[in-house]
UniProtKB/Swiss-Prot annotation:
May act in a signal transduction pathway. This protein undergoes an ATP-dependent autophosphorylation at a conserved histidine residue in the kinase core, and a phosphoryl group is then transferred to a conserved aspartate residue in the receiver domain. Gene3D superfamilies: 1.10.287.130, 3.40.50.2300, Histidine kinase-like ATPase, C-terminal domain, PAS domain. Signal peptide: none annotated. SMART domains: HATPase_c, HisKA, PAS, REC. This is Hybrid signal transduction histidine kinase E. The keyword Kinase applies. The keyword Transmembrane helix applies. Residues 678-950 form the Histidine kinase domain. Residues 412-432, 1198-1212, 1271-1282 have a biased composition (Polar residues). Its EC number is 2.7.13.3. NCBIfam families: sensory_box (TIGR00229). It is an enzyme of class 2 (transferase).
Amino acid sequence: MDKLKINNNLSPPSSPSSSTTTPNLSSTNLENNLNSNINNNINNFNLNNSTNTFNNSNNIIINNNNNNNNNNNNNNNNNNNNSNNNNNNINNNNPNVNSPNEVILNNNFLKQNKKGFFKRNKKMIEIFLPPKFKSPIYRRCCILLGECGVYVFIYMFFLIFLRSFYPIFICGIVSMIVLYIVSTKTTKYKLVALIYIFVQSILNFTFFLQITNNFNNNTVNINNTDDYSNEVIEFSKLNFLFIMNLILSLISIQIFFPKFTFSITLTCSLNIFNIIIHLISIYSLNTKKLIVFQNLIVPITVSFLLSFYSYILSIDNQEIEAKEKRFRNIFDTSSEALVIHKNGLIIDVNSTFEKIFQIKQSDLINGTIWEYLPELESFFQNTNGNSKYTNQSLQQQLQQQQQQQQQLYNTITNGGNNKQTSTTSANSTPRYNNYNNNNINSNNLNNLNVFNNLNNLNNLNNNNNNHHIHKVSRSNTGLSDSSSIFDDSDSVDFFSMKNINKCPIVLDTVGITPCGSEFCAQVKIERKKDMLIGSGTSSFNLLNNNNNNNNNNNNNNNNNNNNNNNNNNSNNNNNNNSNNNNNNNNINNNISNNIINNNNNNNNSGIITNLSQQSNNLSTTNLNTSSKIINHKHKNSKQDFDVMSIVDISAKKKLMIADQALRRAEELNQAKINFLTTVSHEVRTPINGILASVEILDGSQLDVTQRDFLSCIKQSADYLLDLITDILDFSKIEAGKFELDRVEFNLITMLEESINIVYRTAQERGIEVLTFIDPDVPIILIGDPYRVKQCVLNFLSNAIKFTHKGQVMVKVSIVDQINNNNNNNNNNNNNNNNNNNNNNNNNNNNNNKIVGFSNNNNNNNNNNNNGNNGILNFKLSFSVEDSGVGIKEEVLDCLFTPFHQLGGSPRKYLGTGLGLSISKKLTTLMGGEIGVKSVYGVGSAFSFTSILSTTSTTPISLQSLGSSLSIALNNLSPTIPKISGFIYDDNIHTSNSLFNFLKLMNINLKIINPIINNNNNNNNNNNNNNNNNNNNNNNNNNNNNDNNNNNNNNNDNNIDQQQLKFEFENEIDKYCNVEDDNNNVILIITNQLSNDNLNYFKDKINQLNNSIYWFVLCDNGLKAIDPFYYGIVKKPNNLLNLVDTVFKVYNCQLPQDLYQLLTNGSKDDYKNYLKYRNVVIKKITEDNEKKQQQQQQQQQQMGDTLSSTKSPQYTNLPPLDISSSSNGSLNKSNRSNLLRKSSSVYSDHVAITRGMVQVNRSPRPSTPPPLFNLKGNNSNPNSTELNSTNSVNGNPNNDSTLETIEPLNISETVGDLCSSGSVINNSNFIINNNFLTSSPYGSCLTPNSGTTSPSIPININNNDNNNNNNNNNNNNNNNNNNNNNNNNNNNNNNNNSFKKLEPDNFSPPPSILINDNNIIPALNVTTPITISTSTSSSSSLLINNEINNKSTTSKRPSFIPPLDIQSKKLIINTADENHKNNCIIDFEQIFGQDGKQQPQQQQQQQQQQQQQQQQQQQQQQQQQQQQQQQQQQQQQQQKLNIGNQQQQQILSSPRLQSQLLSNCDSLGNTPPVTPHRRNALIVDDTELNRKVLAQLLRRMDWSVSFAENGIEALKEITSERCFDIIFMDCQMPILDGFETTKLLRLRELENNWKPLNIVALSADSSSSFGQVCFDCGMNGYLGKPITLITLKDTLLKWGGYRD
């Protein structure tokens, strides 16, 4: 009877890996899988399993072997066939092939089965080895056996040579042999190791005591020194053996017990026991201490080292265990669907696979990969199911397989066709096979006579000969439908198993779920090494069956219809029984997660993994004759397994498609951005030409209509320039080419510039623009001020656009302090911000009508920098709040969308809708955020944050600046009096702003709220009460403030003047009744008083002895102010203006460092500031002393007349309206005023771009109203006291020359002041500030950045008007609307622009008529008007300037005609070509000698006389002007010396003017200068730019040369400094400006020339562009659009050479 052996072919061996884990399998599932796949036709087999390896295959090897150790009787009964009793013996230790033939049912490759002597005698070797443990324990147990064996031989050796110690050695030999035997038989490894350590220690210590005792006995009776020395040497040798044995015991502890705690315990115990033994030897055996010390120190040292090593090793083990634990979790927690498979047969999957394919793991048993990935079926296909079997000898076959063991083959069919071609190699066995189609068919089995009645398989594939690749449509997956992934030969080569072994294969295919849904999947196929390092560290549940001699496997099962197999696998005490009954004689062919490990000594193990169709009857005869039997042996117990990761990339594919579409859209968008960028740059060129041309035309002689249209052109061009700039910025940001600058700037100056750009538009709408800055905010910052200002201006422009009444407030606060080293102060800063924000609104607690501020306001400054040495970063918040229409909540989310506008129509509010979008992007670039809060119908609050830096760890905050100002006042005036008083304005927010600024200098004033008539008081009180109840709620405060402000605005004309007078009087009385009233100074700041209140307080203050300084709040809407007011506090309120006011009160001069900090001025500016301030004060003091008596008399005479009128005194004179034509001039002016809104749709637009071109300018109103007192006396009782004190004294910064300034003639003084850009205000104080304007005279080109300059409007007409109610209104026609016309004219005044005096920013003043011969003509003379006092006066002053054309669109400036109080005549000198006459107003004729008004008949007679006098004066002026023109022409043609026209040359040459001003003596006289006409070279490829710039230069008496490109420029420059200045365009097609400049600098070096002044021309005015210009050798750059004021600044700085 043949012996049947079943063996499995395995995958080739591979080295193990311990870094990857595999999924878990329970033993129950494994048993079920095994039993479900074992065919009922297999009779009587044994399974012997191994513990360390797993073998998973799909083949059956039936081997006939003889085994003497295991006898298994397998019985099988069958009704249809003869019973065959087969004795199948499987030898675990030495499998042997006895049968000459073997039957191989194999779809995998074959391996050679090697046999060796060691393997045949494995059973004998196992006797001397320990039982199977886990690998680490097994190795330690082998070491223990080795030590026992070694000690047996050592003790035997010592027994021979050291016979005196034979009892110890005999005990050692016996104990070691016993321990060795016990170790091989028991699994109690730790107990045996512990006994071994204990026995070794006892033997070793006994040996030490014995040698010590012998040494003492032998040395007692020895007297010879040599003998004693020999004994000592002998003892030392034996003691050395003791120490070595002890050290070996300590090392063994560390080896046998790897756990740190247990090993340390044993080590310490052994050392303690050693110490005890040596103590006994010292006291009992008299052992020498040196030997004891040696025996103690050596083991302790070794123990310490070993303990340290054990500790490090334990840490490493913990890390390894943690790493393995993480690896075990990777499988289940992976985001990829992981599949463990063998040749496409699914072994295990993770939870992600279940989610992707929507199937449970339990349903995946017996599944294949291609059921879910159909296109991978061809990957695992090989042949058509015809396995070749050869009849050659076994040895030859094995040799061939051994030669090709390392070569992998794969035969993949054409997956695109239904017909499959199979190829096999004669000398190779394919690695991967198709289990669907390549199964063993019945024909082959019948021919082999292996099985009878073999049936086709039904579970996998009934079509044995048809091999289909399930081609799934890829239309919904993003893959191509044209071909499969395995269609061509290249794919076959690429997807071969050879490539899989080298590197993983990644491919995209189509996945299908059981529901039929398709998706695109990315599959990664790779081969992993077996990572089984033991059952405790692997995620597999292995069936570790320890096979001993006593193991028996009995498989008995009887069934009438089936052959049943019962496999009883015994592993010590574990028995696994599985039964399988199948009535259909069919079994599942796929085994999932079956791992049966066999062969303890790395021998072959058999695994039953796949059984094909089988018959119920076996023919052993055909089996022996037709089959071949190959016993496949594995070299190693560890093998490879295949891993497949699947990722659902449907979304990725769709995203890729969308990404491609997005890329195409981005390309189109980029093309549009490039187009916009190019067009924007190109459009700016003609716009710059338009604006410059308009500025040139504005200086010519135009009538009112022409000037009106010219203003429309200018406003339209400004609007278009802003649109183009927004589009350009937007396109740069979108293209990612936008860069921010980092420069140092002054926050206060930047905010003032921003507010003044928009203030004129706000003033026209009646809106207050206020500033609130928290005290802890730094004022010197590093960042991009241009972009911060742009964001603020965008917010301000929108706020003003959507606000019709109320106010717009700019608030700055600290959000957070970003410190590089410490961030501990962030909370403090935030708390300060909250407190300071509350401080802005707590003035609205209006329980009483008069609200005061206490001294405990929360103005804490807690910016504590704890030793930070780096730059501090602050996150500042800029907020713009308005009381406008508000925004609906549903619209807020769309506000920052590009091109979005409220209401969806740009016609109502204009604009492109890019402002907020650009602001948002700029804020993001600056590291901040943008936000908005709005209540519809109440107002909005837009805010943004920006990260700005400071250059110091102790930044200068606003609070520290105020403290410095307060300290400066104390130093300059040690006996400084206490200031008290109050503030009043019709808008409570204006008072709050003033209060906050004054509080910085420790000046606390009370605030008086607006007092409305009785019908509105209730409403205001309710609002005030609401403010009291909601001080801590910012939103409520804002709303209530807005309501309160709206009430004030609605009732501007309903202010209760009587009640207001009563409140003022009470406050003044309260301050005057103070006991120490001598040192008490009363400071009062109010808006303009009514006529009755003004007269009342004049009389009241004259009766008081206190020092009362009454300042008026003025926004230059006033035509003139009464001398009752001590000074003016300008609107919009700013810190510099208030500082000037406070220093005037104390009669002190501002220190230089504080002046520069407030104004950004230079040292020269400060010197001029002190010089002209002292000169004017000194001269005016003398004039006031001379005229004091006359003015008092005139005031007394005119008092009755002025008090009888209801209008204020400053409206006594009618407005001036003189046009170039005599007929219909008044109608033209009136029509222009009436149609102002309709004349230009952009009249309310804020010209942001032009306002921002001139950076670092402070657009403050320059000329305040004059001291206009018709009574002729000074009503200010304190003016004499102020003027009598020399303000130079006590100032440490004054030059010595300034203290000895002699009195100047008033005409010379004013001429010098005008030439320096300084202006004398009504309080004898010089205002010397910068402001933004395109013309120094405030023409229609003045941008929306300043305020109107005050003037006395005078309307002169030739005919009488009987219906005129005003004394000075004379019209040609009878018109009842004169008052309305006058009012319109009064409300439309422009700025008289003056610039700060510095070399870089100098602008010529208006013409000053010094005497009858010397006239200094203005540069920009259009329709000049000369207003002069009588020539008999010692202080005659004639001012030539432009006419106020009264058109609100043109915004022409008004002039301040000084009044000669003595002669009471006002002479107006016109220089019009058509009407060249002087208009003289004689106030004695109008008011009479006593100051009273005369009847109308007398007035008409006086007017006729005046007209005659005017005609005579006009004729004289015409002659003078003709002479002047002839002289000027001769001077230009002959280039004569300056002579009598010295001042004219100064004005026409800013460079000479700067030099002359610096060389002025104390009297303001300048030394004679020999002038020459300056020459400029313009290098620009655009004709328009050359033309415009040349015209501007010619107006300033410059000669101009041209060059179209750099090559022509190089030809023009032939000698050293042949041009005073060169304007170089940067972008030119032929040799641009940068290269031309470099070539010029090289030429200068070669020829040793002095360098030329080269200024770049470009629309880019950023600091980064400026750095590029400087790097190439340019001196500076001039930004476009070029205005007259920027051109003058450039010429002043680079328009000549000093050396």
